UniProtKB/Swiss-Prot annotation:
Induction: By stress conditions e.g. heat shock. Residues 498-516 have a biased composition (Basic and acidic residues). It comes from Bifidobacterium adolescentis (strain ATCC 15703 / DSM 20083 / NCTC 11814 / E194a). This is Chaperone protein DnaK. The keyword ATP-binding applies. Residues 609-626 have a biased composition (Acidic residues). InterPro entries: ATPase_NBD, Chaperone_DnaK, Heat_shock_70_CS, HSP70_C_sf, HSP70_peptide-bd_sf, Hsp_70_fam. The modification Phosphothreonine is found at residue 175. The keyword DNA-binding does not apply. Pfam families: HSP70.
Length: 626
């Protein structure tokens, strides 16, 4: 039976954790780091690179490197590489497969089950896309849980027995969430974590702060050189990396230098060099509008929960972007001067909470109950384009609601059920989740047929909808025709492709190892022959040298089987070197032993004739001692 893990599938970085002896442990990746960049690249040879190695080569491979794909989850966005269109689910699956491989190497056993986190404000299509990514990666997705909820789960387990109200402020690389949760513990140490309200912005994160710096640098270059870098992909990638680094440095310093050589060339051939100083004050001024966008979700959460700032007991910061001093100051201002809790690692706490939830679902931990909510209202379009809500936002999940509707026209044979998610009054202003048709309605005057529409939201926050004609008993379940929901056969195809790519990568790695071993063996054998030429017969030396050359020739090609065959033949021939050297050594040892025996016999004879000398010496010693 495989292990269960918790995965924080982030915009910028991802993290994986598991339970060891009931306690959550963050798993280090193959590079020895505790987080993995959510970057996927396709090398010119077709190899798929993931993580730090993909991030490092981004400048030289801009068009084939994908980052921040989380922002495209739940959309019909695709990227074409070598004639194949890749969906956000498939790109995300590559990140998950890397995390899975590294976890299996770390744990020494298969990883089969996972709890994967997503932003609290993700809609149904985005949640389904996240779940599909896990499936494509070969994982059984136990649950999709909200990132702030996972963070509160990790934080809450370390607290005492008192009931507390926690505000989680989660600003990541691409998304922003605010959640209010109540954590209660009974005398037996059983924790109940209940989400009271959640709000957010799925297009606000550290990437936007980076973009402000990039735009400023592009403007500075344009003013100084008259060169527009906004269309130069390689220059933009270099600026992106510099902007990210500058943002990080400004969290601990009041100014930073951005220096880059040969960014581009002017029309007259002058190289474009960049050497700018960015102060924290200037950075905060240029990003003040982004900071302002954090206020509305915060205020909405307090309003929805019906509480004041004074009712918040603790504030927990999640996501690397909360390290920015301006963000910390904003949180302090919004919460009436409360200092944020610093006891959790903002980069790891979400994965830790997901690992705890995986243990709860698998039965490894029985001391916690998690009650989450749906972040957005759900409803259908009714006459006049009105959004009729069946489930209000911040309703505890799982939940199920039904309502009876009727026809708008006489003898209407079918009804089109259009499902939406959002808070606006008119359906057109909300997010369409999908459409399905209930047909075969018996002829009747308008308003007579009774059509029961049922919304069912599971523990993952994923929506299932059905409609039933109460007169005929005819029922129809929702199949997504809008949004980005992938049909099962498409997911199955992607799973097979992902497995095939993994098999290709594994074979490529094995082939590289075979080649390296063969090169090393050829070098060592050649050196052995050269070092022992005087001890080897010409026949042996020539035979081995010929086999070394055959292996070297095979290594120039791509035929791995030919390399293996040549290496095997060289190994057989190389054994003759050992035989020759050992035979020569054996002869030398035998000659040495015979010489030693002769010397011993001669020594005995001479000792017999010199007895008086030896005796005299012994007597003299005795006399000295006396």
């Amino acid at each position: 039976m495989g292990r269960a893990v918790g995965i924080d599938l982030g915009t910028t970085n991802s993290c994986i954790a598991t339970l060891e002896g009931g306690q959550p442990t963050v798993i280090v990746n193959a590079e020895g780091a505790r987080t993995t960049p959510s970057v996927v690249a396709f090398s010119k040879s077709g190899e798929i690179l993931v993580g730090e190695v993909a991030k490092r080569q981004a400048v030289t491979n801009v068009d084939r490197t994908i980052s921040s794909v989380k922002r495209h989850m739940g959309t019909d966005w695709t990227v074409e590489i070598d004639g194949k269109k890749w969906t956000p689910q498939e790109i995300s699956a590559q990140v998950l497969m890397k995390l899975k491989r590294d976890a299996e190497a770390y744990l020494g056993e298969p990883v089969t089950d996972a709890v994967i986190t997503c932003p609290a404000y993700f809609n149904d299509a985005q949640r389904q896309a996240t779940k599909d990514a896990g499936t494509i990666a070969g994982l059984n997705v136990l649950r999709i849980i909200n990132e702030p909820t996972a963070a509160a789960l990790a934080y809450g387990l370390e607290k005492g027995k008192e009931d507390e109200r926690i505000l989680v402020f989660d600003l990541g690389g691409g998304t922003f969430d605010v959640s209010l949760l109540e954590i209660g513990k009974d005398d037996d140490g059983f924790s109940t974590i209940q989400v009271q309200a959640t709000n957010g912005d799925n297009h606000l994160g550290g990437d936007d702060w980076d973009q402000k710096i990039i735009d400023w640098l592009v403007g500075e270059v344009k003013n100084k050189y008259g060169v527009d870098l906004s269309k130069d992909k390689i220059a933009l990638q270099r600026l992106k990396e510099a902007a990210e680094q500058a943002k990080k440095e400004l969290s601990s310093s009041t100014s930073t230098s951005i220096s880059m050589q040969y960014l581009a060339m002017t029309p007259d051939g002058t190289p474009v060099h960049l050497d700018e100083t960015l102060t924290r004050a200037h950075f905060e001024e240029m990003t003040s509008d982004l900071l302002g966008r954090c206020r509305t979700p915060f205020n909405n959460v307090l309003r929805d929960a019906g509480i004041g700032v004074s009712d918040i007991d603790h504030v927990v910061l999640v996501g690397g972007s909360t390290r920015m001093p301006a963000v910390k100051e904003l949180v302090k201002e919004l919460t009436g001067g409360k200092e944020a809790n610093q006891s959790v690692n903002p980069d790891e706490v979400v994965a830790v909470g997901a690992a705890v939830q995986s243990g709860v679902i698998k039965g490894d931990r029985k001391d916690v109950l998690l009650i989450d909510v749906t972040p957005l209202s759900l409803g259908i379009e009714t006459k006049g384009g009105i959004m009729t809500k069946l489930i209000e936002r911040n309703t505890a999940i799982p939940t199920k609601r039904s309502e009876v509707f009727s026809t708008a026209e006489d003898n209407q044979p079918s009804v089109l059920i259009q499902v939406y998610q959002g808070e606006r009054e008119f359906a057109r202003d909300n997010k369409p989740l999908g459409t399905f048709e209930l047909t075969g309605i018996a002829p009747a005057p308008r308003g007579v047929p009774q059509i029961e529409v049922t919304f069912d939201i599971d523990a993952n926050g994923i929506v299932h909808v059905s409609a039933k004609d109460k007169g005929t008993g005819k029922e129809q379940s929702m199949t997504i025709t809008g949004g980005s929901g992938l049909p099962k056969d498409e997911i199955d195809r992607m799973v097979k492709e992902a497995e095939a790519h993994e098999a290709e990568d594994k074979k490529r790695k094995e082939d590289a190892e075979t080649r390296n071993q063969a090169e090393s063996f050829a070098y060592q054998t050649e050196k052995l022959v050269n070092d022992n030429k005087d001890k080897l017969s010409d026949d042996v030396a020539k035979e081995v040298t010929d086999k070394v050359n055959e292996l070297k020739e095979a290594l120039k090609g791509e035929d791995i089987e030919k390399i293996k065959s040549a290496q095997t033949e060289l190994m057989t021939s190389a054994q003759k070197i050992g035989q020759a050297l050992y035979a020569q050594q054996g002869a030398a040892d035998a000659a040495g032993a015979a010489g030693a025996a002769g010397a011993g016999a001669a020594g005995s004879a001479s000792n017999g004739s010199d007895d008086d000398v030896v005796d005299a010496e012994v007597v003299d010693d005795d006399k000295d001692n006396k």
